[in-house]
Design a protein with these regions (language model features):
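Short beta-strand-to-loop capping motifs
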Residues: 6, 155, 213-217, 311-315
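Active-site metal-coordination/substrate-binding segment of hydrolases
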Residues: 12-94, 99-110, 132, 147-150, ...
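Acidic-enriched catalytic cores of C-N bond-cleaving enzymes acting on peptides and small amides
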Residues: 126, 143-148, 167-197, 217-292, ...
Length: 370
């Protein structure tokens, strides 16, 4: 964590202290064809019309906008103010360890303004709590039979995004698309799974999923046609949100072994049944998501013979979050997986009568008239 303090303007020492809070980390997500080391390479930012964006990676505006805003307040001499503190926490995107590690009493301010938002003209007055579901399948190897063809099944071109901010946009999930194809292909053509690598980060909507499957030589053409037909159906269903969805099926090297059929079947059904996306909208604030979940990761490990999946559940109502967690646990435990929870943190309940909210609304209204 980083804490920066700025003394009050002379004569304003008796005013209430203000804490400007943000976080230093970002969601480091990139396209599979982009060569980028987030620990060493700078973000390739460029201007596209009225927007600053990045080339093949996330930009880091979450929470770069908030951090830069707080630093601007610190560096200007044009604002009269009481004591100001800037609190920039670490690992907000991966469990809030920085915030959780903050000792009581370290911050001296009376008012805290959270700068972790990026929508002009909007004030954030609450936030969902979250919890991770860590899912583990153990599997055995089955020898690859004779008379089959190995095919890569790649889902790319989806928008992805932050699983909290972008979840109301109803974007597709590449893992869900992959298993939608696999489920139909197994039922109709007996297609078997050798390996799967879906998603990249626990708090990002999966934009890509890659796998290797095998199919009887005689059924190859039918499977390929089926995969592209399902892909076209998904593109039609998500025409407004996923216009660039791509499905690639092409021959590859035959694997030595497959994930055992029973595990494949049960896991596939669990992924199909797993809740995903917006679960419930708020009854009190129109347009606000109350409860949501995102199937973020699903990856096989051939060396350890395991398949790990991860869901991040969010809700501003703790009891609803716990209910959703138990639903997801039930789905995967019925399929034979082990499910554990981690990283639970509470929500920030909105207070529509907050005097700070009224002040912020008045300050915004003066120059903009709205």
């Amino acid at each position: 964590n980083v804490i920066i303090r700025k003394p009050a303007t002379p004569g304003m020492e008796d005013r209430k202290g203000v804490v400007l809070q943000g976080h230093l980390d970002m969601v480091p997500q990139k396209n599979s064809d982009k060569k980028h080391d987030f620990e060493a390479d700078p973000i390739e930012a460029f201007v596209d019309g009225e927007w600053v964006t990045a080339n093949g990676t996330t930009l880091g505006a979450d929470n770069g906008i908030g951090v830069s805003s707080a630093l601007a307040v610190l560096t200007t001499d044009k604002i009269k103010h009481g004591p100001v503190e800037v609190l920039l926490t670490a690992t907000e995107e991966t469990g809030m360890d920085g915030a959780n590690g903050l000792k009581p009493g370290v911050m001296k301010g009376d008012i805290l303004i959270n700068t972790d938002s990026e929508d002009e003209g909007e004030l954030y007055v609450g936030c969902a709590g979250g919890e991770d579901a860590n899912i583990l399948f153990n599997y055995t190897n089955e020898e690859t039979p004779y008379g089959v063809v190995a095919l890569k099944l790649d889902i790319t071109g989806m928008k992805g995004g932050h699983s909290g901010i972008d979840i109301p946009l109803q974007r597709g999930n590449a893992i869900k698309v992959f298993f939608r194809i696999l489920n139909a292909a197994y039922e109709e053509h007996g297609v078997r799974l050798a390996r799967i690598d879906g998603g990249s980060l626990r708090n990002a909507i999966p934009r890509e999923a890659f796998g290797v499957v095998v199919v009887d030589e005689a059924k190859t053409a039918d499977f390929v046609a089926q995969a592209y037909e399902i892909a076209q159906n998904v593109k039609s269903e998500l025409a407004e949100t996923e216009p660039d969805l791509k499905v690639l099926v092409e021959e590859t090297e035959l694997p030595f072994s497959l994930i055992d059929e029973e595990t494949q079947r049960k896991m596939t059904k669990a992924v199909i049944a797993c809740p995903n996306g917006v679960i419930r909208m708020s009854d009190t604030m129109p347009g606000l998501v109350e409860t949501s979940t995102n199937l973020a990761l699903l990856k096989s490990d051939e060396q350890n013979k395991t398949i790990k999946a991860g869901c991040l559940m969010r809700s501003s109502v703790d009891s609803a979050k716990e209910d959703l967690a138990q639903r997801i646990k039930a789905v995967f435990e019925l399929a034979g997986a082990k499910v554990e929870f981690s990283g639970n943190y509470p929500g920030w309940k909105p207070n529509m009568d907050s005097p700070i909210l009224k002040t912020m609304q008045d300050v915004y209204n003066r120059p903009f008239g709205k």
